[in-house]
């Protein structure tokens, strides 16, 4: 049905003679649901800060700009779409207008280009119910993640644990290198704290008294 729906959209654009002047963007806001499918070789699923929860496909068709069949390896994030579409539409940013993302137009024109961005950030200071290997009752507990180059750091706010992964060598995030790479942990954590301060991102000020990492989610019965 997804293929049919995308085809219907493109057919309508062709019928209205708008297909040569329309940008089509296809993406997901999160990874696949673990109970329905497998995200292998990625770890985790929808609602988690592991790659299985935040890495998803992105396909862009921009007639006359993007090269059909080209592949770009530059990591991007959802907040990049707003500045991208502003630039594509020729909309000038207001003076002093601060945006979280960056325009992807350079990448759409040249898939081999790179963005001048030091890090990508994810911030989730809340609980999401559901079983995981790390927690029996929560798919996600309050946490944040940062990616700088091939390195990724995850901070769990409840217990302060830090997990470090090299995504180039360990895309499945099986080997936590935090103990072996303390200087890299320090570097990424400092960048994370700096971003958090600049954006005034909310962080839990105290632990949830009802939080129990050993708790197990009990399935609800049907009425």
Language-model features: where?
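Surface-exposed patches in mature extracellular/periplasmic domains of secreted proteins
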Residues: 20-21, 93-96, 202-206
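Loop/turn elements at helix/coil->beta-strand transitions in domains of secreted/extracellular proteins
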Residues: 18-24, 115-117, 149-151, 184
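C-terminal cap/loop subdomain of S1 sulfatases and analogous C-terminal strand-loop tails that border
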Residues: 31-38, 44-49, 66-70, 74, ...
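A generic secondary-structure signal for well-formed alpha-helical elements
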Residues: 10-13, 17, 31, 63, ...
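Long, internal low-complexity/basic segments
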Residues: 81, 127, 148, 158-161, ...
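Beta-strand elements within well-structured catalytic alpha/beta cores of enzymes
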Residues: 6, 13, 23-28, 58-59, ...
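Extracytoplasmic/secreted proteins, especially bacterial periplasmic and envelope-associated proteins
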Residues: 1-8, 37, 80, 84, ...
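Histidine-centered active-site microenvironments of extracellular/periplasmic hydrolases
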Residues: 11-65, 77, 137, 222-223
């Amino acid at each position: 049905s997804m293929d049919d729906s995308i085809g219907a959209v493109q057919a309508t654009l062709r019928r209205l003679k708008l297909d040569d002047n329309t940008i089509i963007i296809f993406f997901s806001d999160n990874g696949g649901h673990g109970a329905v499918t497998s995200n292998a070789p990625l770890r985790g699923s929808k609602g988690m800060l592991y790659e299985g929860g935040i890495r998803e496909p992105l396909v862009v068709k921009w007639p006359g700009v993007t090269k059909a069949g080209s592949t770009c390896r530059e990591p991007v994030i959802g907040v990049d779409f707003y500045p991208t579409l502003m630039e594509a539409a020729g909309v000038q940013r207001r003076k002093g207008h601060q945006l979280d993302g960056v325009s992807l137009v350079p990448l759409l024109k040249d898939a081999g280009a790179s963005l001048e961005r030091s890090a990508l950030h994810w911030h989730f200071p809340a609980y999401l119910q559901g079983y995981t290997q790390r927690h029996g009752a929560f798919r996600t507990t309050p946490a944040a993640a940062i990616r700088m180059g091939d390195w990724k750091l995850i901070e769990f706010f409840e217990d302060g644990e830090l997990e470090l992964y090299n995504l180039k060598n360990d895309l499945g995030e099986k080997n936590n290198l935090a103990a072996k790479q303390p200087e890299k942990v320090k570097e990424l954590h400092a960048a994370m704290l700096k971003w958090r301060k600049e954006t005034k991102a909310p962080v839990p000020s105290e632990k949830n008294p009802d939080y129990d990492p050993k708790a197990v989610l009990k399935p609800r019965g049907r009425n």
